[in-house]
Design a protein with these regions (language model features):
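Terminal amphipathic alpha-helical/low-complexity segments used for targeting or macromolecular assembly
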Residues: 1-165, 169-170, 176, 187
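Core mixed alpha/beta domains of very large multi-subunit molecular machines
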Residues: 165-209
Length: 209
C-alpha cells in the first residue's frame, strides 16, 4: 500500500481532535482514503503507518502498522509493536505490546509426561500430535529428534526476526487487561483475558478461534 506524509491541514485537524505525536513526520497515512476526522484523542510515538478508513479513539499507539478499516477504541496504557490486519477491532484494552526478538511462544520447551523435564517438547505453532508423540516417546531416535528440534529452532528464529507482532485480519480483541508478545491469527476473537504472554493464537477465516 502506498503511504504519504500528513499534510499540514490534516495535522491541524488531528490536533483539534485532541491527537498528538512525538513527531508528526513519522506518521504516514494511506495515499487514498485516510480521514483525520475519524481519529480522536490518540497519541502517536515512533514509526506509524495508518491505512484507509481507520477509526481510532482514546489510545496511545507506538511503532505500529494499522491496516485499512481497523477500529481501535480505548487502549488505557499502550498499543506498541504490532502490525494490525485489515478490519481488526481492538477495544477496551489495558496494554498490548510486542517486543522485537520475541518468538511468541515458538521454541519454548515444556515438560511432557515426565515433569522433571527429561522429555521436554519445544512448542511451535505447527506442532501436531504426531510430532509431539515422536519427541516424547521416541527419544532413542536421536538423529530424527535432532533434525526435528533444529527445524523448530530455525522456525522460532524466523519469528524472532520479525520487526513486529501481528493481529490478523478481522480479528477482535476486547475487554482484555494485558497482552504481551502474543501473535493473533486472522478472525480470532480474544475477549476478557486478564493476561496473555509469549504465545500464538492460531486462527484462520475458515476456522476462526
Amino acid at each position: 500500500m502506498p503511504y504519504r506524509k500528513l499534510t499540514q491541514c490534516e495535522i491541524d485537524a488531528l490536533v483539534a481532535s485532541g491527537c498528538e505525536a512525538e513527531d508528526w513526520q513519522r506518521v504516514e497515512v494511506a495515499d487514498v482514503g485516510f480521514d483525520p476526522t475519524r481519529l480522536r484523542h490518540v497519541r502517536f510515538s515512533g514509526q506509524i503507518s495508518l491505512g484507509s478508513a481507520v477509526d481510532l479513539r482514546d489510545a496511545t499507539i507506538c511503532d505500529c502498522m494499522v491496516g485499512d478499516g481497523v477500529r481501535i477504541d480505548g487502549v488505557r496504557s499502550a498499543l506498541a509493536g504490532y502490525e494490525i490486519g485489515r478490519g481488526a477491532r481492538l477495544t477496551d484494552i489495558g496494554t498490548m505490546t510486542y517486543r522485537a526478538g520475541t518468538t511468541a511462544g515458538n521454541g519454548v520447551r515444556v515438560a511432557a509426561v515426565n515433569e522433571n523435564g527429561g522429555r521436554a517438547v519445544p512448542l511451535f505453532d505447527g506442532l501436531t500430535a504426531q510430532t509431539a508423540h515422536l519427541m516424547v516417546f521416541h527419544r532413542h531416535r536421536t538423529e530424527t529428534l535432532r533434525r526435528t528440534f533444529d527445524r523448530i529452532d530455525a522456525y522460532a528464529a524466523t519469528i524472532a526476526a520479525a520487526p513486529r507482532g501481528y493481529v490478523g485480519e478481522g480479528a477482535t480483541v476486547e475487554g482484555c487487561g494485558r497482552i504481551v508478545d502474543v501473535r493473533i491469527g486472522d478472525r480470532a476473537t480474544v475477549c476478557g483475558a486478564t493476561l496473555l504472554q509469549n504465545g500464538t493464537i492460531l486462527s484462520q477465516p475458515e476456522a476462526p478461534t
